[in-house]
Structures are given as structure tokens and as C-alpha cells.
Amino acid sequence: MANTKTINAKITFNDGNVINLELYPELAPITVNNFVNLCKAKFYDGLCFHRVIDKFMIQGGGFVWDERRGLVDKNAPSIKGEFKSNGVNNPIKHEKGVISMARTQVKDSASSQFFICVADTPFLDGEYAAFGKCRDEESIKVAVKYGKVKTGRWQYYSDIPLQPIVIKTIEIEQ
């Protein structure tokens, strides 16, 4: 987004891969502030990407994978959804490499879970709070690679990576 202030973030995974992001606080201030605060509080450290769908998105930020108990929920407070169908002008398109907040059917239910698009997903535009994008092509390649991993089911969850994709940390670079 040209001429827009950015905040850089760096997701480091336990396997050594990295996704570099640029966040847009002027376009989605509540969402960026929430994400940055959770990162600074180390909320995401040790959480996994629990839902990956090839040619769609990879989603994480809400669960720890426990070998004995499976997916263990980690809760954070909900925030206002910053997207058009919720009365907020958010011009960020859900293109390959864009990061956006996951939510339930309730428009103001986003909290900590986010997803990174691994393909253009225009049907999400105006319905989910996009708030940044991958800063470089290598970061997009990492996201796409994770989107292609083998997945399975656990209880009522589907599209769970068979080999956990674990966030080591997310650093904010201001």
C-alpha cells in the first residue's frame, strides 16, 4: 500500500522458516494494535497453525498442539471487525500473501487467530479484517509451502497439519 505507514513483523517458526510481514495501522488500527500487543506479550509463542488449506489460506494464532490432548485453545479478548460489511472502510484486498483476522460468523469475534492467504481470495474482501501482507516473495513461498502440507482430522477439527507448524515467536520491528 503506497504512502501508508507500516509496522514490520517477523514470524519465526520452530523449523527455522520465517515469514516477514508489513502491517497497516492506518488502514486497520484496532486490528494492528491488537496483533502488535499480542506479539509483544509473547502470546503467539508456541502456538500452531491449526488449519491449512492448499490454494486458500493457512490459519494460526489460537491453539497449542499437545501430543496427549490435541488442540488446546488459547483465548484472547475479541475486537471490532474492521471490514466493509461491519461498517468499516478497509481497502486491503485478500490477495496472495495478505494477513487477515479469522473470526466466527459473529462480525466482532476476531481475537488472536489470523490467516495468511496463499492464493487470491476476493470472496473474503469486505468480510474479514485484512491488516497487512508478506513483505517479500520468500515469505509468500513459505506460506504457500505450509499450505501444501498433509492434513488430517482431530475430533471436530479438519485441515490440521499432520506435522505441527509451530510459531517460535513473532517479533515486532518498529
Question: What is each residue range found by the language model?
Answer:
Residues 1-174:
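Cyclophilin-like peptidyl-prolyl cis-trans isomerases
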